[in-house]
A protein has these predicted regions:
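N-terminal Rossmann NAD(P)H-binding glycine-rich loop of SDR-like oxidoreductase domains
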Residues: 3-23
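Glycine-rich Rossmann NAD(P)(H)-binding loop
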Residues: 166, 188-194, 221-228, 237-243, ...
């Protein structure tokens, strides 16, 4: 079976290629520039065209049995025009799905985001039956892409992962790692809000699982570790991985909220101080197994 992966050199793409090869698939990686580092031996590297050009994809889809679509503009929070999110994440994804349908591709797995369903915080545990309420251009572009893909004739599965962690991740997780490495006590013991996270390896396993499970066709799934964690638990797990005790002390949450407002970064408080729990039960019910101990997984990650 031949699988074409877009975004193959990215954070999820790297472990996914290994998982697909380990399962015996012939893997084709669509890349926009020569990959660094070089992709695993046996991966067929093909030039990835502009996402918005459906016609340019047709030659690359000949003989392909399944497409895993990872490529897109990530949620950066700043500096990306709304129209750019729509062009790449919605229009580009829809163009690829239409091209795959015309080429007779049998499966299409679209990696969306929990932000297609919710803002950075939610008042209840999210499930797939909730009405989607994205709060930013990134989330709206992903939700619109889901609808456009469903409107094609291709058998598709949509995955909505929460924030991920794993080797090589930058952004917020990397900032927390740098914070955990400081030889200082940290004032986060009082932040008890919980957030769902997702091991990148578990994400790769989820993609492989839905490819191998026909009853997931036509469905949308939240992807998350089994148990949400607090920021205090995350930092304690990180410090355990580098051989330190937690060294956390309490500071009232209101102080963090005021500090974030003072520097014009209320988005930081939304991400760190808000609660976002996403329930992966639907995907688990059809046989997928998540990471059950997020704290231990983070400790292992930093200890490696």
């Amino acid at each position: 079976m031949k699988v074409l992966v877009t975004g193959a050199t990215g954070f999820v793409g790297r472990p996914l290629l290994a998982a697909l090869q380990g399962a015996g698939y012939e893997v084709h990686a669509a890349v926009r520039r020569p990959p660094q580092p070089v992709l695993p031996v046996g991966v067929v590297v093909v030039p990835g065209p502009d996402l918005g050009d459906a016609g340019a994809w047709r030659g690359l889809l000949d003989g392909i049995d399944a497409v895993v679509h990872l490529a897109g503009i990530a949620h950066t929070g700043r500096g990306v025009p709304d129209a750019r999110y729509d062009l790449v994440n919605r229009q580009g994804s829809a163009a690829l799905a239409r091209a795959a349908a015309l080429a007779g591709v049998g499966r299409f797995v679209f990696v969306s985001s929990i932000r297609a369903q919710s803002g950075p915080a939610a008042t209840h545990a999210l499930t797939e039956t909730d009405e989607p309420r994205p709060t930013d251009p990134y989330g709206r572009s992903k939700l619109a892409a889901e609808a456009d893909i469903r409107a094609t004739d291709i058998p598709s599965t949509i995955l909505r992962p929460v924030a991920m962690y794993g080797p090589g991740l930058k952004g917020n997780f990397d900032a927390l790692v740098r914070l955990a490495r400081l030889p200082l006590p940290l004032p986060f013991a009082s932040l008890r809000n919980r957030r769902s996270l997702l091991s990148v390896q578990a994400m790769a396993d989820a993609i492989l699982f839905v490819l191998q499970t026909p009853k997931t066709i036509g469905q949308t799934f939240i992807v998350a570790d089994a148990r949400p964690v607090t920021l205090a638990e995350i930092l304690a797990a990180m410090r355990a991985g580098i051989g330190r005790g937690p060294f956390l002390f309490p500071l009232p949450p209101a102080a963090f909220r005021l500090a974030a407002k003072a520097i014009g970064r209320t988005d930081l408080w939304d991400r760190l101080g808000g609660e976002l729990i996403a329930d992966p039960s639907r995907l688990m019910a059809v046989g997928w197994r998540p990471e059950y101990d997020t704290s231990s997984a983070i400790t292992r990650l930093l200890g490696s």
